[in-house]
Amino acid sequence: MVRRRVLLATFPAQGHINPALQFAKRLLKAGTDVTFFTSVYAWRRMANTASAAAGNPPGLDFVAFSDGYDDGLKPCGDGKRYMSEMKARGSEALRNLLLNNHDVTFVVYSHLFAWAAEVARESQVPSALLWVEPATVLCIYYFYFNGYADEIDAGSDEIQLPRLPPLEQRSLPTFLLPETPERFRLMMKEKLETLDGEEKAKVLVNTFDALEPDALTAIDRYELIGIGPLIPSAFLDGGDPSETSYGGDLFEKSEENNCVEWLDTKPKSSVVYVSFGSVLRFPKAQMEEIGKGLLACGRPFLWMIREQKNDDGEEEEEELSCIGELKKMGKIVSWCSQLEVLAHPALGCFVTHCGWNSAVESLSCGVPVVAVPQWFDQTTNAKLIEDAWGTGVRVRMNEGGGVDGSEIERCVEMVMDGGEKSKLVRENAIKWKTLAREAMGEDGSSLKNLNAFLHQVARA
């Protein structure tokens, strides 16, 4: 029997690579081979980190193309030119690959690689979008460009869109806020126009039916398919206890003392974990406020602070003024295995930027959240966490758009102090952890949805 082969065209950022690799592993388990298509920069970083030491599983191969930025985009680089070069060079590479490799029967692409769908269409290869944000966010974008722009732009405190809960302006994706440059809205419009080029576009979403039942059915024009949570099996259904990482880290985890060993010394549900993802960089003044808030809580904490380097690769961050006190009370690392941390019994709460991967991971591990959203989908994710699922609280920004240390303290205590709100948040966190695992279980909705999708791939 000839095995099917799906090509995964994946944007070279950790937030896209992690769910794409996990999706690839699920395809492999179902008997479908995978070609992982990404940039040279991402491929090199993935190949050089410890997570890649075990090698590729059978049926998975990597194809890397040069986007002109093989050493990555510098912190002060031209993002617009970067995306333009990515599209031009990536399209050419994918076109040649599909022309010369007739084994590929289906293309699945990241939304920042929407051009991959256009190339697939030219090559008469069917495609689907792998959406790595909540279905709710895709619905908001869709309705904005399909009749609801005036209502959303009006800045009302109660924006009502079809089949979605009421939204206020601060909970919209930041691409739709008045202060965001128009080119970002146009970029998202182009992504949706790519989907509109299909008769009934398929969108694979890193969510599950019970989590977003209304959003998954809100757009008649598209077929939204919940296939998540896309996280390693050891932290979800337990089908493969050895699968403890995504397998494609762009950054090495900290070698200075083992985070898990440190957590082993702490009481159950006592530690505050603080991480703002692989991209976000706060100014020093904001970092000082976060530090003050953690010290005021008086609880042990694990704080992941990425090393910040300038265009010449030199470290440029200054030490926090309270670094000595912070190191006495908690542990600061430059990188760690987030899932191992979230799954540890000592974890009591997660202070996060609310990137969707982090949101899904905390939900799947049953960890309450303090939401500190900054941009993109994070603001909507925070709304869902606080109001729809009840698994956390969202910080209140000060007049300057930052977060005071006292607000960090207030929110951490709200989910950690054992009071009525704390108990409710923890009960909800456990409930959604159970539902997430059920979704990927043997009779779960996501597994059924994935199998139905693969049946369609087989007929392609």
UniProtKB/Swiss-Prot annotation:
Pathway: Pigment biosynthesis; anthocyanin biosynthesis. It catalyses: an anthocyanidin 3-O-beta-D-glucoside + UDP-alpha-D-glucose = an anthocyanidin 3,5-di-O-beta-D-glucoside + UDP + 2 H(+). Residues 1-22 form the signal peptide. UDP-alpha-D-glucose binds at residues 338, 353, 356-358, 361, 377-378. One of its GO terms (biological process) is pigmentation. Gene3D superfamilies: Glycogen Phosphorylase B (3.40.50.2000). GO terms for molecular function: hexosyltransferase activity; quercetin 3-O-glucosyltransferase activity; quercetin 7-O-glucosyltransferase activity; UDP-D-glucose:delphinidin 3-O-glucosyl-5-O-caffeoylglucoside -O-beta-D-glucosyltransferase activity. It is an enzyme of class 2 (transferase). It holds the Pfam family UDPGT. Its EC number is 2.4.1.298. Optimum pH is 8.0-8.5. Keywords: Glycosyltransferase, Signal, Transferase. Belongs to the UDP-glycosyltransferase family. Catalyzes the glucosylation at the O-5 position of anthocyanidin 3-glucosides to form anthocyanidin 3,5-di-O-glucosides using UDP-glucose as sugar donor. Anthocyanidin 3,5-di-O-glucosides are molecules that are responsible for pigmentation. Also acts on anthocyanidin 3-O-(6-O-malonylglucoside). Much less active with hydroxycinnamoylglucose derivatives. No activity in the absence of the 3-O-glucoside group. This is Anthocyanidin 3-O-glucoside 5-O-glucosyltransferase 1. It comes from Perilla frutescens (Beefsteak mint).
